Structure formats: structure tokens, C-alpha cells
């Protein structure tokens, strides 16, 4: 399964919104440096989708706000 995410780093509070099926807007409080925001996005996706973090892989957009994640079965 492929999930698209629009990330908003340095937010005042963390939030995850499902814009449409398999497309999320995620706000994280951490800065976009040294992979901190990406790690936090994976943690939030994991909790929201109720799956282990190890099943979520960043496929595209490591340094972009628009990201594509693969959920591994």
C-alpha cells in the first residue's frame, strides 16, 4: 500500500488529518533537520494506522514536504 503525506514541521501541536484515502496532512513539532521530522511522521503514522513502525518505509521525499511512504505487508 502506498500512502502520500504532506508534512508541516515546526507546528505548534502535532496533528494528523486524512485529506482523502491514503493521503494525509501531518503536523509535527520537531524541525526538519537530520531526519527528525521524518522519524516523527513515521511514529505518528504507525499509531494512526495501528501498525508497527518497521512496516513503514519512506520511498520518496526525504527532504521534501511531500512524501510517499510504502506500507509493507
Curated annotation (Swiss-Prot):
Coiled coil: none annotated. It comes from the Bacteria. Disulfide bonds: none annotated. InterPro entries: DUF167, YggU-like_sf. GO terms for cellular component: cytoplasm. It holds the Pfam family DUF167. Belongs to the UPF0235 family. This is UPF0235 protein PERMA_1406. The lineage of its organism: Bacteria, Pseudomonadati, Aquificota, Aquificia, Aquificales.
Amino acid at each position: 500500500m502506498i500512502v502520500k503525506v504532506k508534512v508541516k514541521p515546526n507546528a505548534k501541536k502535532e496533528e494528523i488529518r486524512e485529506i482523502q484515502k491514503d493521503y494525509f496532512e501531518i503536523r509535527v513539532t520537531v524541525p526538519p533537520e537530520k531526519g527528525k521530522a521524518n522519524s516523527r511522521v513515521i511514529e505518528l503514522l504507525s499509531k494512526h494506522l495501528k501498525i508497527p513502525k518497521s512496516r513503514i518505509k519512506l520511498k520518496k521525499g526525504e527532504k521534501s514536504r511531500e512524501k510517499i511512504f510504502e506500507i509493507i505487508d
